[in-house]
């Protein structure tokens, strides 16, 4: 099961602008798919029902890719999409972070219907990661945008009141970049505080999903560079992975121990990662 990583380019980082594939021992396989529709790739998610990889392209489109590395569906260019992260929701649709509109949209996996706003436009100053909790609530990390504007919190939206979120997390040491739900139902967030600062503190932080209190902090403890942490993903055997500037860093979620870099590549500028197929 290879590890796939989106490597940013352009304004998002001086990376390779490609979807890269690594062996589980960290060996670089190369580019998973070479297609000019993949530009400054961002969010990734696997649809287990069809075993397809969904990729958010900086070319304002979403692509569905087979395990053989072929594009099998393409939304075509959606004006102003500017997608960020992507996940599958409880209803089976593909949810996309909309950076310019500061909200979240959803698409059917068949791409046969228009993008639908799930939350109102500009619901946060700048959306970072988001995920659905085990109780159906939608958690959205609100962070700092490229222009330096924004806030640092996590909001919770209930299905019945998506317009009136609750401010779940108020942590002065948090500046979120991505968000995922842990096997125990808690929220884990990658953080760079202050965002963009040369002396920023990098961490992965776990919060209680019910009251938002800080449970624990994962840190590299000298076993990894861990600069510019971005996308989070849980892998096999309780492995928590976080992609960063030059590496993918692994943590044992149960113990909290940093396992070091499980893959390294100078200028990786990783944005998101998945294990696929």
Task: Please annotate each region the language model reported.
Residues 245-277:
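Blade-level signature of beta-propeller repeat domains, shared across WD40, Kelch, NHL, RCC1
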Residues 8-10, 57-58, 99-100, 143-145, ...:
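Short loop/turn segments immediately following the C-termini of beta-strands
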Residues 16-20, 61-64, 102-106, 152-156, ...:
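A short loop-to-beta-strand structural motif that recurs across blades of beta-propeller domains
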